[in-house]
Design a protein with these regions (language model features):
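Flexible loop/hinge segments at secondary-structure junctions
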Residues: 22-523
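Gram-negative bacterial Sec-dependent N-terminal signal peptides
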Residues: 1-21
Length: 523
């Protein structure tokens, strides 16, 4: 059996279509995976795109002809038990034959099983794809390994199943070669500190083995623990101002690019080093928002993360130029009394969220991705996340502005907001696909870059401060003549690629191809 993986931000919107043969379940409600009726595809890489993939697979807003799964039938979502799917997940659905590209495939199978590995981030969608080597995915075809958590509703929610997972244990993992990968930035960026453990830096020779396709502009943002956000509001607007604790865009505090670089390169070790007039941020904070220590905590991503790679590109020039300073590295068990920033390296976006939230509350959830040892009270922490995260404000962290600009589709399309990159899909040209898998992968990539699909997936990224998420790239789609974002068909007028050169996120973005009448907004 082979592997089917949906791009971390692409899977969800692709569901829907004509009814097909029902998926068979056992007495415990666990699907029985039948190789004769199920295409299997394995996708590894970007964890930041995870919510996008969920939406791609479930949204009924996506036109029927563009869906991958049949949303008229129940969809099953598998998650690794320990992290609740932050590291590993898989989706089982009826294949949507109302999509012309998926009708009449060889093998005549009715169902689709897509495995998605988030653990290790974007580089796991690059380095193993180049090497065409097996990495661990979730094992879902052993009923004793899995338990149903909740029942879903067709077209609305998944039936959720948890499966025990242990990397390196073939009884509790599924080693497979990724059919394709997804990365927040283009593959060449995975060198130096961006190289994942166990793999070599990406070279020009490596790139020649791949087909790489830019699919979407993905917006990132600086995330801070909620009490830190509130303290920043106190320092910005005054402790008694109505903006303190508010989620409105006019109440979002801001950090400048140079301040962000100073923090993430480890130049600051205490929140007292962020000055407020003749005082400082820590001393200025009210008792309810002040942490028990002024030590600066950073939730960063592990080497190989695309989220971390884009942070380096946008704020430190790393690895784009030889004199760039790379981000500060994990400090491990360093005592908090040492005058050095505490750096916590997280393997996925879900783990990043946990790091920020648990430091904010001074608590720890045993057995999950982040082991918080700072349990005497709250700490202020800062991190980086894709803007499709936490739109429902369910985690104890918040986005802030960068250089005074909020991270919205509108501000990106106007050329005002800087922290966005173009994510790519890639597959190895020599990879051996099972029957019809290549056609499914091609359609998955195509629909991931479809602005009509993005309009549907972006509904999960509506924040109190504006619409965030993804925009289609201008290489395959036309931006509006005015340069304003069309939320029903969002296309970025800017690109890190040119009409003569492929996407490279180290390139300063510019308008792609305005023709004789197109343009960009002045304000």
């Amino acid at each position: 059996m082979k592997k089917l993986i949906l791009a971390a931000a692409v899977s969800t919107a692709l569901l829907g279509g004509a009814a097909q043969a029902a998926i068979t379940v056992d007495g415990n409600g666990i699907p029985v995976i039948n190789a004769a009726t199920t295409y299997e595809i394995f996708l590894s890489g970007s964890s930041a795109a995870g919510p996008f993939i969920d939406s791609l697979l479930t949204s009924s807003k996506v036109p029927v002809a563009n869906r991958i799964c049949d949303s008229a039938q129940l969809i099953y979502k598998y998650s690794d038990t320990a992290t609740g799917g932050k590291d590993q997940k898989a989706y089982l659905c009826a294949l949507n034959t109302a999509n012309p590209a998926l009708k009449g495939l060889a093998g005549n199978k009715t169902n689709l099983l897509v495995y998605k590995r988030d653990n290790g981030g974007s580089a796991q969608g690059v380095s193993p794809v180049i090497a065409d080597t097996a990495i661990d995915f979730l094992k879902v075809d052993t009923a004793a390994n899995c338990a149903k958590v909740s029942d879903g509703v067709a077209g609305t929610s998944f039936t959720k199943i948890n499966c025990d997972y242990t990397s390196g244990n073939v009884a509790l993992s599924n080693p497979q070669k990724p059919d394709f990968g997804i990365s927040d930035v283009d593959p060449v960026q995975f060198q130096g500190d961006n190289t994942p453990s166990g793999f070599a830096p990406v070279t020009a020779a490596d790139l020649s083995q791949l087909t790489v396709k830019a699919a979407a502009s993905q917006i990132f943002g600086i995330a801070v623990s909620t009490k830190l956000r509130n303290a920043m509001q106190e320092a910005t607007f005054g402790a008694s101002n109505v903006c303190v604790g508010s989620e409105k865009p006019e109440c979002m505090p801001s950090l400048g690019s140079a301040q962000i670089a100073s923090i993430f390169t480890g130049k600051l070790n205490s929140w007292k080093q962020l000055k407020v007039a003749t005082g400082d941020l820590f001393t200025n904070a009210s008792a309810k928002n002040k942490p028990v220590s002024d030590r600066l905590h950073i939730c960063r991503r592990t080497s190989g993360s695309g989220t971390g790679a884009q942070l380096g590109i946008k704020f430190m020039g790393y690895p784009c130029n030889d004199v760039a300073t790379q981000g500060a590295v994990d400090t491990g068990a360093l005592p908090e009394t040492v005058a050095k920033a505490q750096i916590h390296a997280m393997s996925s976006s879900g783990a990043m969220s946990e790091c920020l939230s648990e430091l904010n509350s001074g608590t720890d959830t045993v057995g999950t991705s982040f082991s918080n040892t700072f349990l005497t009270g709250a700490r202020w922490a800062i991190g980086i996340q894709g803007t499709e995260q936490n739109a429902g404000l369910t985690s104890d962290w918040r986005f802030i502005k960068i250089d005074g600009i909020e991270p919205t589709l509108d501000k990106v399309a106007r050329g005002k907001y800087k922290d966005w990159v173009e994510l790519t899909y890639q597959y190895n040209n020599a990879h051996a696909f099972d029957t019809s898998e290549k056609a499914i992968v091609d359609e998955f990539i195509k629909e991931s870059g479809n602005p009509l699909v993005m309009a549907a997936t972006n509904l999960a990224a509506v924040h109190t401060w504006g619409q965030a998420g993804f925009l289609a790239t201008p290489q395959s789609n036309s931006a509006t003549i005015s340069g304003l974002v069309d939320y029903a068909k969002p296309v970025n007028p800017f690109s890190h690629g040119t009409t003569d050169a492929a996407t490279n996120n180290c390139r300063i973005p510019a308008i792609y191809n305005p023709g004789t009448t197109g343009g960009i907004q002045f304000k």
